[in-house]
Amino acid sequence: MTPFMTEDFLLDTEFARRLYHDYAKDQPIFDYHCHLPPQQIAEDYRFKNLYDIWLKGDHYKWRAMRTNGVAERLCTGDASDREKFDAWAATVPHTIGNPLYHWTHLELRRPFGITGKLLSPSTADEIWNECNELLAQDNFSARGIMQQMNVKMVGTTDDPIDSLEHHAEIAKDGSFTIKVLPSWRPDKAFNIEQATFNDYMAKLGEVSDTDIRRFADLQTALTKRLDHFAAHGCKVSDHALDVVMFAEANEAELDSILARRLAGETLSEHEVAQFKTAVLVFLGAEYARRGWVQQYHIGALRNNNLRQFKLLGPDVGFDSINDRPMAEELSKLLSKQNEENLLPKTILYCLNPRDNEVLGTMIGNFQGEGMPGKMQFGSGWWFNDQKDGMERQMTQLAQLGLLSRFVGMLTDSRSFLSYTRHEYFRRILCQMIGRWVEAGEAPADINLLGEMVKNICFNNARDYFAIELN
């Protein structure tokens, strides 16, 4: 019987153990996509307690707690921090088989140093007190944890209208060497069907000093904000494409669509597709000219529970996997961007694992001369960010493309404790390659495979995003 979560956790061959301990474990972290609040990094936030750093805002945990019958007041409601933590501690023993069980105990181990102890109601007091004592120390502040975890770069997720004042404050602080850069997330600028679109256009017009009436005005406003982001070191964009759409339109049609929407009219699905296509093609060309990377997160079915959406708002754990086809529209969108050779470096993520092979083959259609891995099939996302999901994504990438050119893991998280997801990914990567070697499917060449592992863990992302590190 193998003990739970030893130093060789998941490393079930000797070759995997060598790969992990000698090549993967000590690689720095290049976390190119996350949702950390830049203000907390700028002010070097001190966490009040274990709830504050671990449960607050974590919709993964809330979903598990609801499934365990926990009352909503103990998830997102007015219960005390300790009551919410106790509700989580009572849920954890029921999460065996869910990645939350592994994540929980990896996060207790690093950075808190708690090993050989499982979170449950019987250990809740001890773990709460021990972690809170550590959180009072300087090296457990927001910056302190990032430094402990050997982070070199994080890319936050930021709206085009954001001032980026906190990024500027961080950049001026020469004592803090981790790169904290904004990522451009323009969803509100192209989701023309949303009720909030007109208000957003007013805000975008205000910050860009542009009166947005025609499509060219929107392009001008977005270009000004792209320049603002570039001035703060941005090299990455991200887009939530819940449904991939494609429909072409001329400028007169786009002007009409925008004008009618600003006048409060409801658009047809075809008109929505025309507008979204035009914005994405325009933005893609801008990214290509600037050497940016674009990311498409495809296939979420959001806000399914309308009652809870009205009570609690979005992003609180009521989203799931969509099953709408995407291949043809995605192909047309990428091909349109590529017509003038202005398809930027692109990472494609799918939420439905059914679409893994769709993306794994799609990227091969648009690779770039002289640019290894220009088109990337992104790491297992959200519901696929677990052992089976990562294995599936990497196996299919290896079979359909070049795993060796993969830019690897990202946390996509709102928590400063989520850096152990990089460790989890690295262990799974080494386990997978070790099994290939054990089965005679890959050569037992530690130098060849060790270098490949180092590249996937850090070097490929560093080179792909072309961000100068401190």
From Swiss-Prot:
EC number: 5.3.1.12
Entry's induction text: Repressed by LeuO and H-NS. Part of the uxaCA operon.
SUPFAM superfamilies: Metallo-dependent hydrolases
Superkingdom: Bacteria
GO molecular function per UniProt: glucuronate isomerase activity
GO biological process: D-galacturonate catabolic process; D-glucuronate catabolic process
Keywords: Isomerase
InterPro entries attached to this UniProt entry: Metal_Hydrolase (IPR032466), Uronate_isomerase (IPR003766)
Reaction it catalyzes: D-glucuronate = D-fructuronate; aldehydo-D-galacturonate = keto-D-tagaturonate
Pfam families registered for this protein in UniProt: UxaC (PF02614)
Pathway in which the depicted protein is active: Carbohydrate metabolism; pentose and glucuronate interconversion
Similarity-based family: Belongs to the metallo-dependent hydrolases superfamily. Uronate isomerase family.
NCBIfam families: PRK02925.1
HAMAP family assigned: UxaC
Entry protein name: Uronate isomerase
The organism of origin for this protein: Escherichia coli (strain K12)
Phylogenetic lineage: Bacteria, Pseudomonadati, Pseudomonadota, Gammaproteobacteria, Enterobacterales
